[in-house]
Design a protein with these regions (language model features):
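Alpha/beta enzyme core
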Residues: 4-298, 304, 310-323
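Catalytic or ion-coupling anion/metal-binding cores of large enzyme and transporter domains
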Residues: 171-195, 229, 233-235, 272, ...
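C-terminal catalytic subdomain
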Residues: 300-309, 314-361
């Protein structure tokens, strides 16, 4: 009889996926199993996704990075998207979310799942309009459920559903004045559907039906935050927290049913509120893994939002966020190109690594210490090997090499290099500067 990762963990069974994750994390298998059983770690791994190399998300594990990809009606270039996927995997992203909103979405989704070793996530409500070829207001609750089943059958490892907003939220949004209302794309569609049809949110009303589908294929739920703040002024407001309370309740229901769940979080949050947001989520959601978009710590940096978001991501990770959704320089401006994707990934790999060091993840700082030793002896090849982006590090140094270079220094300091001077001084060698 098939059991989900959560059911197996509760039953005391260490699955082959848990063994892989435990080895990657250098963690005892039984410790990992107990964390999965407690709902504090998830291993998104659809039984149909046979090419996956599973990763764990949650307590005591390395911080993971997700990359959002997908075409829109204005930019449809499948070859370009495939190249972005390949680049994301090469650069170390642990997850890709397929957010296609135009064209034959299923062909790309199936190809992605068939070949990708990383976990794949989707937002089924995007695909509902395309798959059923209906306008939003014409879709039925059954249409949404059918799309979820289709994604599960195709092998999607986790799905984002915005189950936390209800008819009550409509009144809250109208009465509680926000500067930016709802900025979640999926959340705005659910809000609009409820407004047009007069019906309750189908992802909330039929949550038990969704759990049945997820359990059948072992799809992890990513409970989306429709009311995440889209600007600093809306951070940590009534709408955000009220929804988070409901998401925590839904996560507990999923756990009781044997379905893994994680919680999505903000958004745009001032730096001084990030720790508080992480602690509120920890309390309300019983330690379920927290998946955050950034958060962005200022609203005024379009073109540089990979930086504003990575700052927030590092702090969020330090205080407990387990999963960071990358942000690119194109955020708020355009569909990201391949260079934007790389910039976003590198910013968030740095943020995730910095958070792991701050949280004391075992062995997280080893590579930093190895880099320091390589710098101490001016071993450039060893430094490149330690770098998150060896190709870029090598390219920068070699394109601006010092005129008098014997493999020791760089053009920043040349013979004024502090490391070179100290090495020679400690070895009682003559220090030539001119």
């Amino acid at each position: 009889m098939f059991m989900t990762q959560l059911e197996s963990a509760v039953a005391g069974v260490v699955t082959k996926e848990m063994k892989v994750v435990a080895e990657k994390e250098r963690m005892d298998e039984e410790v990992l199993r107990s964390l999965v059983a407690a709902g504090k770690v998830v291993i998104p791994c659809n039984k149909q996704h046979t090419s996956i190399s599973p990763e764990g998300i949650g307590k005591r594990l390395r911080t993971k990075v997700n990359v959002n990809l997908g075409t829109s009606k204005d930019v449809t270039d499948y070859d370009s998207e495939i190249e972005k996927v390949n680049r994301a995997i090469r650069l170390g992203a642990e997850s890709i979310m397929d957010l296609y909103t135009h064209g034959d979405t299923r062909i790309f989704r199936r190809k992605l799942i068939e070949t990708s070793p990383v976990m794949i996530g989707t937002v089924p409500i995007y695909d509902s309009v395309i798959h059923h070829q209906k306008d939003l207001g014409e879709l039925t609750a059954q249409d949404f459920l059918d799309t979820i089943r289709l994604h599960a059958q195709d092998g999607v490892d986790f799905i984002t559903i915005h189950s936390g907003i209800t008819r009550k939220t409509i009144d809250q949004i109208k009465n509680h004045k926000r500067l930016l209302n709802i900025v979640s794309r999926g959340g705005s569609l659910v809000f609009a559907w409820m407004s047009m049809t007069g019906h309750e949110n189908p992802f909330y009303e039929y949550f038990d039906e969704i759990l049945k589908i997820c359990k059948e294929y072992d799809v992890t739920l990513s409970l989306g935050d429709a009311c995440r703040p889209g600007c600093l002024a809306d951070a940590t407001d009534v709408c955000q927290i009220e929804e988070l309370v409901r998401l925590g309740e839904l996560a507990k229901r999923a756990k009781q049913y044997g379905v893994q769940a994680m919680i999505e979080g903000p958004g745009h949050v001032p730096l001084h509120q990030i720790q508080m947001n992480m602690e509120i989520q920890e309390s309300l959601c019983d330690g379920a893994p927290f998946y955050v978009l950034g958060p962005l710590v200022t609203d005024i940096a379009p073109g540089y939002d990979h930086i504003t978001a990575a700052i927030g991501g590092a702090v969020a990770g330090m205080y407990g966020a387990s999963f960071l959704c990358y942000v690119t320089p194109a955020e708020h401006l355009a569909l990201p190109n391949a260079d934007d994707v790389k910039d976003g990934i590198m910013a968030f790999k740095i943020a995730a690594h910095a958070a792991d060091i701050a949280r004391g993840i075992p062995n997280a700082r080893d590579i930093d210490d190895t880099m320091a030793k390589a710098r101490q002896v001016l071993d450039w090849e060893a430094q490149y090997a330690c770098a998150l982006d060896p190709e870029r590090a090598r390219s920068i140094r070699e394109s601006r090499a010092p005129e008098e270079d014997h493999g020791e220094t760089c053009s920043m300091c040349g013979k004024f290099c502090a490391v070179r001077s100290m090495n020679k001084a400690l070895q009682e060698e003559y220090i030539d500067i001119l």
